């Protein structure tokens, strides 16, 4: 079976990042309350809990297929994911405090790129 979900650990934040590529609802059975992507959706980002093998909180980014992993979509979903993770940690971000979101969004984008290039 071809892998469709990859897990990443940001180390300094108490949440995981999961990247799904063409993952179906069945592939995501270990996650809590996840629905199929709508037909018109290219990618989405969702704060979520994984229930098996142990309970973990984090963010799931799903792409319909490898071709949908474009610069535009990676940037868009990376910012959503970084905002979700920082919000969970109580980190406030604004014009005078841009570094946390910039670094975290960059890390998320790098994780997505590794999935796209098959480097994980």
Label each residue range with its predicted role.
Residues 1-44:
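Non-catalytic terminal regions of proteins
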Residues 18-20, 55-56, 116-117:
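Intrinsically disordered, low-complexity segments enriched in small/polar residues
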Residues 26-69, 81-85:
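Active-site scaffold of zinc-dependent metalloenzymes
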Residues 68-72, 91:
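Alpha-helical hydrophobic/aromatic positions enriched in membrane-embedded helices and signal peptides
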Residues 74-76:
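A short, structured loop/turn motif at beta-sheet edges
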Residues 78-95:
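Catalytic Zn2+-binding segment of zinc metalloproteases
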Residues 93-120:
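Post-HExxH zinc-binding segment in Zn-dependent metallohydrolases
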């Amino acid at each position: 079976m071809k892998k469709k979900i990859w897990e990443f650990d940001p180390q300094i934040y108490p949440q995981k990042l999961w990247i799904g590529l063409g993952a179906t609802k069945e592939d995501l059975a270990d996650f809590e309350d996840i629905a199929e992507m709508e037909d018109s959706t290219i990618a989405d980002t969702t704060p979520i809990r994984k229930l098996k093998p142990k309970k973990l909180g984090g963010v799931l980014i799903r792409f319909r297929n490898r071709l949908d992993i474009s610069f535009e979509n990676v940037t868009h979903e990376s910012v959503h994911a970084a905002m979700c993770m920082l919000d969970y940690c109580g980190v406030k971000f604004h014009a005078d405090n841009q570094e946390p979101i910039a670094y975290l969004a960059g890390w998320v984008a790098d994780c997505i790129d590794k999935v796209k290039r098959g480097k994980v």
